[in-house]
Amino acid sequence: MKEIAHSQAYGNRVFSRDSAVDSKKDVSISAEQPKTISKLTPYLFEGDIFLSTKQAMNILDSLASKNKTNKKGQQRMAHDAPLYLFRGANEKGKRFAAEYDAKWFQFPIKYRFDESLDILHISQILKALEIWQSNTCIKFENDQEASGDYIEFFEGDGCYSMVGRFGGRQGISIGKGCERTGTIIHEVGHTLGLWHEQSRPDAEEYITVVKEYIIPSYISEFLTRSEHEITTFNVPYDLGSVMHYGSTAFSIDQRSKTLLTKDPFYQMTIGQRDSLSFYNIKLINEAYCKGDCKEKNECKNGGYLNPSNCQSCLCPSGFGGSKCEMHASSESNSKCGGTLKAIIDWQYIESPGYPDGYPTNVICNWLIETDKEERIEISFEDNFGIFCSSTCVDYIELKIGNDLANTGYRICCYDKPNDSLVSAKYQAVIIFRATTGEDTGFKLKFRKTMKPAQTTPSLPKTTTTAPHTTIVGNDIWSEWGEWSQCSRSCGACGIKSRLRICKTAQCSGKVQQFLTCNLQACPVDIRCTKVKFKNRLCADGNTCGKPGELLSSCSRPSCCPPFENVDGKCQTDQPLLIPLE
């Protein structure tokens, strides 16, 4: 596969020479995701995917077909986006993809934790799964004795997974550095059936691949799929997808950009690993949850009924209210956000604390509106400074296109747009998010205008409805079931869980509870003294240092980080996602 793509991109250049050099390099698909170490790269596709035999053969067949029909042209390339591996049965004139059975059919999806994971890894995995569950109809259930088709999370040498359901035990590696919630969300997205965003057939409309800066033998990692290989369920391309490559994916020096957004204001948006975007969620809901809600969709501004709770709307970022009719509530100790009316005179918005510096953990949402025949002009003023990173982590986001459900321009660092920006319609959404740094912030002004704006295609309308109830009412739960056995015998390394059943169509609250368990410290490993003593031998075979001190240090019963042994019990002052017994 790599050799064919290399030949198509570079002609007579010798692949084996490039591969020999490139195989020694670690690679990265986003600055916000840990690197893939060189010893794993021969086994992974696009940096973090284990392909099935069928998937690999389909990609090879597609490459060979393109090579035959387009020898004089250049191979199309693009960027990672959430795409499905299978097609729906109702698509006329189109067969199922070879991997149609990669869709999960049995719910809840069972998963278990390997003993290699510590409690902090487990906490972050649970947080990521809860984000998927609260926004989709997909449900997960922890079962340490799982059999049949199930996911096993383990600590491998990096972050990687498979695309879609393989059958039987299916691993997701959450190695060191992969504990970030957005990274885990990304890998679970693969397991549910999502490809990288830039793999979409329409990616080249939004992204340009700069092959001069790509590690040569990895040019294959930028190929697009055809419409016959994947389906997007008519969900638009999303430059803010958690599944998208970053700007420097597979870069020869990890600094030069290999992906350029056609709209330069999106350049620092791609590659985020914070959380799911609105269209990440919608894609999974279209694939798995279509028709779960039977009620009329009265959600506004691109929102739709939440298949996890059909009495509520899933709203695009920046929108809130019961029907997505207003601005989303802000999260800040400082007053910010609101719904504002643009008039002919300039009005001003600024970040909390401007210009003396914004606090951390701030989310502000503004919805600006004017009359329907008018537009909104926005211009930045005075000093500008937002924590700088190649993919914006802290940012001001401007949603000013025709599609306010899609991710907007995310702007950070110290160069503000010089010219005024004009919205495509009578609404504009402004989001300020700060989680990492403290910097100057921003100040902007806005007013209504009749100036023209460049527009993008509008979206198809979505209609969803609510499910038939088995018991009249809502929030009727069964009693909690019995606690499962603890996954580990000691050291506060394990968890136990219990389940309850929702007896109505909708229930608020959690289906499964977790507890950290077996908080007694683990007994001393009898091998500890041998290992410690051996590590103290000098090169000439004589004993170095003071082995007695080392032996005493490993004679205490042990606990899993971040717990410490206090009188034989494992304790910690750090806040955890999993309640302690």
Swiss-Prot record:
It is an enzyme of class 3 (hydrolase). Zn(2+) binds at residues 186, 190, 196. PROSITE patterns: ASTACIN, CUB, EGF_1, EGF_2, TSP1, ZINC_PROTEASE. Its cofactor is Zn(2+). The keyword Glycoprotein applies. Residues 336-449 form the CUB domain. GO terms for biological process: proteolysis. The active site is at 187. Binds 1 zinc ion per subunit. Inhibited by 1,10-phenanthroline. Residues 474-523 form the TSP type-1 domain. Pfam families: Astacin, CUB, TSP_1. Residues 285-325 form the EGF-like domain. GO terms for cellular component: extracellular region. It is found in: Secreted. Its EC number is 3.4.24.-. Glycans are attached at residues 67, 418. Disulfide bonds join 137-289, 159-178, 293-313, 315-324, 336-364, 486-517, 490-522, 502-507. The keyword Disulfide bond applies. Residues 97-290 form the Peptidase M12A domain. GO terms for molecular function: metalloendopeptidase activity; zinc ion binding. Its main location: secreted. Keywords: Cleavage on pair of basic residues, Disulfide bond, EGF-like domain, Glycoprotein, Hydrolase, Metal-binding, Metalloprotease, Protease, Secreted, Zinc, Zymogen. Residues 1-95 form a propeptide. Metalloprotease. Involved in molting, a process during larval stages in which a new cuticle is formed and the old cuticle is shed. This is Zinc metalloproteinase nas-36. The gene is nas-36.
